[in-house]
């Protein structure tokens, strides 16, 4: 079982390989500040080599790895070991991103390995059928995002958000639903949350912004605003 918990609403920031070194840390610090300011949980999907530094420098964000392998302790040159992620300070891992896809059997084994060491799992799905199948594996969160929209600046519409939420919750109401792809600014974030998602997230929208800290603040503020409007 996972040792940690994500509260809704939440927001995911994944700098991928757009940033490295101090730029990753500074983005994480901005996310940490905004998380506390707005009372919104933030998953920071961190390059593996920066996990320890980011985890030690922040207090409010949930530091995730971008990938993990299902190997046990032992052989596995260049693989990412679950126990090593925990030791570095990670609370969870992303899996099955379109840029790092896994076949279903490997994905199931990797989710199981993550659970063994208490890591949360945020698993990407490219279709409703895949989302349904992944939900049955009981990850922490399913990320429903059409791969053709990733990095385009074109976000999903409210119909997709509602369908993804229903798809996941009909299989397991305890699995969280993050709907993303093409999230570029606070308005995109607001539109996604107000349409019914537990969460949304951004990679290039934050990492490539002219003022990254300001964009992170804008996006996380939009999560809070939309969620409060939905529930008041």
What are these regions (language model features)?
Residues 110-116, 156-159, 205-232:
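C-terminal helical cap(s) of enzyme catalytic domains, especially alpha/beta-barrels
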Residues 91-102, 141-154, 195-216:
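Glycine-rich phosphate-binding active-site loops on the catalytic face of alpha/beta enzymes
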Residues 71-72, 78, 139-166, 175, ...:
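Glycine/Thr-rich beta-alpha phosphate-binding loop at enzyme active sites
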Residues 80, 125-138, 182-200:
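Catalytic cores of alpha/beta
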Residues 1-80, 121, 131-138:
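Conserved N-terminal beta1-alpha1 strand-loop-helix module at the mouth
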Residues 16, 47, 85, 145, ...:
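Conserved, mostly hydrophobic/aromatic
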Residues 59-114:
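Glycine/small-residue-rich loop that forms an oxyanion/phosphate-binding "nest" at active or ligand-binding sites
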Residues 66-77, 104-105, 123-128, 176-187:
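Glycine-rich beta-to-alpha transition loops that act as phosphate-gripper elements at the mouths
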């Amino acid at each position: 079982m996972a040792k940690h918990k994500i509260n809704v609403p939440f927001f995911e920031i994944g700098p991928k390989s757009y940033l490295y070194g101090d730029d990753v840390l500074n983005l994480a610090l901005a996310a940490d500040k905004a998380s506390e300011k707005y009372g919104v949980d933030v998953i920071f999907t961190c390059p593996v080599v920066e996990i320890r530094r980011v985890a030690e420098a922040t207090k409010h964000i949930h530091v995730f790895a971008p990938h993990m392998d299902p190997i046990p302790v032992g052989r596995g040159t260049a693989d990412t070991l679950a126990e090593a992620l925990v030791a570095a300070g990670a609370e969870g891992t992303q899996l099955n991103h379109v840029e790092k896809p896994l076949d279903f059997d490997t994905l199931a084994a990797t989710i199981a390995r993550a659970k063994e060491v208490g890591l949360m799992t945020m698993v990407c799905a490219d279709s409703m059928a895949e989302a349904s199948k992944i939900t049955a594996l009981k990850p922490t969160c399913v990320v429903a995002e059409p791969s053709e929209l990733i990095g385009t600046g074109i976000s999903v519409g409210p119909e997709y958000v509602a369908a993804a939420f229903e798809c996941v919750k009909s299989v397991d109401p305890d699995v969280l639903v993050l709907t993303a792809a093409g999230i570029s600014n606070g308005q995109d974030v607001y539109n996604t949350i107000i349409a019914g998602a537990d969460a949304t997230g951004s990679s290039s929208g934050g990492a490539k912004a002219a003022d990254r800290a300001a964009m992170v603040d804008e996006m996380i503020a939009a999560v809070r605003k939309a969620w409060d409007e939905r529930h008041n």
